[in-house]
């Protein structure tokens, strides 16, 4: 992999985690106004609808004929549909498990346990015979320790909410690995759009028959919905898919876990929240893990 392309992928994933981390306030406000399926479903549709004109603009600028699929090759179109469906289903399951589990545990514990996908990914990699270097294992361990210091401020015990969120972390790990499998085969913007159409459609039955949000609640939440739909879904997740094309999955997972670091830093910078030495130490460890993950393996 060319160093220039690797750097490009790192920048994309950093931007992705930055957007996710700084979007925490908007998502919290939206969650107070709408049920989890309503908020996630509507923002998914917004993300998909935002990406459709982006696809048209990109095609026009590159001189390609306007087409949602971007190809007449049935195999490439099949890869695109399969990738979008797989990633959309996985993302919906992970988001639902996270939202369910967080009702029974603290936000800090949920954040830490979710970030354990950085540990789960290399374990799953071994199952599919992917080579993981010693430095990558070290980076994963350091990043996990950093996430613990950032997210956990009280004693650690396990309850049913923690187990649900752990299941969410496993699904997120599979989601990241699925993106790695498809990102070399398909256009990232198109796959991202399909992913969010799938997320929205899977949420729709629950929105209609269970949560039944009032129009006044949706209009009251328009700003956090727009932010989460356009920034978190439309832009950030697309950056994730595009960035993973150039970065190995271990480094990608650590870069994506910076969401928690950026969330803490954003709270300190913009909301006047206190940043403890424990949290600062955790941030330093995660950044150190990023450097470790990029070190070459000794021959």
Question: Could you tell me what each predicted segment is?
Answer:
Residues 37, 47-51, 121-122, 157-211:
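Transmembrane alpha-helical segments that form core, pore/gating elements
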């Amino acid at each position: 992999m060319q160093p220039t392309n690797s750097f490009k992928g790192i920048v994309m994933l950093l931007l992705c985690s930055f957007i996710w981390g700084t979007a925490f306030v908007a998502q919290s406000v939206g969650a107070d106004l709408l049920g989890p399926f309503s908020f996630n479903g509507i923002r998914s549709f917004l993300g998909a609808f935002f990406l459709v004109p982006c696809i048209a603009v990109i095609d026009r600028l590159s001189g390609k004929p306007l087409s949602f699929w971007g190809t007449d090759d049935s195999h490439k179109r099949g890869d695109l549909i399969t990738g979008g469906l797989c990633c959309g289903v996985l993302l919906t399951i992970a988001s639902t498990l996270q939202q369910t589990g967080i009702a029974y545990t603290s936000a800090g514990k949920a954040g830490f346990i979710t970030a354990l996908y950085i540990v789960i990914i290399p374990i799953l990699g071994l199952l599919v015979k992917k080579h993981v270097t010693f430095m990558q294992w070290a980076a994963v361990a350091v990043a996990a320790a950093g996430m613990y210091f950032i997210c956990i401020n009280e004693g650690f015990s396990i309850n049913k909410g923690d187990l649900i969120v752990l299941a969410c972390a496993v699904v997120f790990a599979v989601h990241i690995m699925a993106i790695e499998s498809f990102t070399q085969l398909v256009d990232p913007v198109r796959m991202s759009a399909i992913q969010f159409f799938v997320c929205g459609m899977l949420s729709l039955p629950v929105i209609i028959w269970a949560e039944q949000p009032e129009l006044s609640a949706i209009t009251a939440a328009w700003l956090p919905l727009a932010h989460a739909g356009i920034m978190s879904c439309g832009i950030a997740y697309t950056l994730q898919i595009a960035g993973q094309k150039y970065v190995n999955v271990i480094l990608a997972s650590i870069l994506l876990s910076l969401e928690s670091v950026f969330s803490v830093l954003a709270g300190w910078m913009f909301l006047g929240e206190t940043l403890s030495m424990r949290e600062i130490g955790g941030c330093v460890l995660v950044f150190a893990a990023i450097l470790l993950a990029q070190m070459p393996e000794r021959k």
